[in-house]
Regions:
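Structured, non-membrane catalytic/scaffold regions adjacent to prosthetic-group chemistry
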Residues: 1-167
Length: 167
């Protein structure tokens, strides 16, 4: 989730998706988001943009920050400590979508799957992360479609990126 930029660059350019995967091409008109709980919600990009909007300035650090110092060195972006940045994100809050889909507190965790793919251990796979239900139901989580006042760039997860402040 990072690119080579100075630490804490105010433009947020260093918060790009880069877990070693190629940046996928996405046609937003054909793309949709599925949220599965007791009910399944399928939302188009336009549907998401019609929902209530929220903004947040968030500093993020790539999970792979510092991996250039690992032995043996992994095949990936050779980050030292520069994979940190701050950006202004805009999108729709996650919690109402989870509630509409019937994802409740009886769930243990929520798995988020990106379109970016990579190879780990000779197995091709999509980038995935999970959050506990407690974390996922926080009010400050955003499904962001804008970054710093413009559309979310492809290298930052276009058309949609989960933003979890403090994670």
């Amino acid at each position: 989730m990072a690119r080579r930029q100075p630490a804490a660059n105010a433009t947020g350019e260093q918060a790009a998706s880069d877990a070693g995967e190629d940046v996928p091409y996405v046609d937003a008109d054909a793309w949709s988001l599925a949220v599965r709980g007791e009910r399944e919600l399928t939302l188009s990009f336009d549907d998401l943009k019609q929902r209530p909007r929220a903004e947040a300035t968030v500093t993020m650090e790539c999970a792979g920050n510092g991996r250039a110092r690992l032995e043996p060195r992994p095949v990936s972006q050779p980050w030292l400590l520069e994979a940190v940045g701050t950006a202004r994100w805009a999108g729709t809050p996650l919690r109402p979508l989870l509630e509409e889909a019937g994802v409740g507190e009886s769930a243990v965790e929520i798995l988020f799957t990106g379109l970016d793919r990579g190879v780990e251990g000779e197995i091709e796979q999509n980038y995935q992360r999970s959050l506990s239900i407690e974390e996922a139901l926080r009010d400050d989580l955003l499904l962001a479609y804008e970054m710093n006042g413009g559309p979310l760039p492809p290298q930052h997860g276009y058309p949609l990126r989960l933003v979890v402040p403090g994670w």
